[in-house]
UniProtKB/Swiss-Prot annotation:
This is Large ribosomal subunit protein bL28. The keyword Ribonucleoprotein applies. GO terms for molecular function: structural constituent of ribosome. GO terms for biological process: translation. Keywords: Ribonucleoprotein, Ribosomal protein.
């Protein structure tokens, strides 16, 4: 499993630990990933995604999982999230007809 958020694309960052004497040693900043089950109101399905903690509050702020994923850019979504977005769009258009 990659260390990357499936909805925002946030991944591992690299930097330095800097001591008091200004010695620099390389380190990795890992995202705070959580495996979360999101419920779609449109498809009435549950989807388990690996997202960072900040993304969870962003989804709530956007008005739910469906609203967030429909606004999200396809370039940052994982292939799994893109498939979910496609399914939501198809279901939404089928219900509107």
């Amino acid at each position: 499993m990659s260390r990357k958020c499936e909805l925002t694309g946030v991944g591992v960052l690299y930097g330095n630990n800097v001591s008091h004497s200004q010695r620099k040693t390389r380190r990795r900043f890992k995202p705070n990933l959580r495996s979360v089950k999101f419920t779609s109101d449109i498809t009435a399905g549950e989807y388990r995604l690996s997202v960072n903690a900040r993304c969870i509050s962003s989804v709530e702020k956007a008005g739910g999982f469906d609203a967030y994923i429909l606004k999200a850019d396809d370039n940052v979504l994982s292939s799994n999230a893109r498939a979910i977005k496609k399914k939501i769009i198809q279901t939404k258009t089928a219900k509107s007809l």
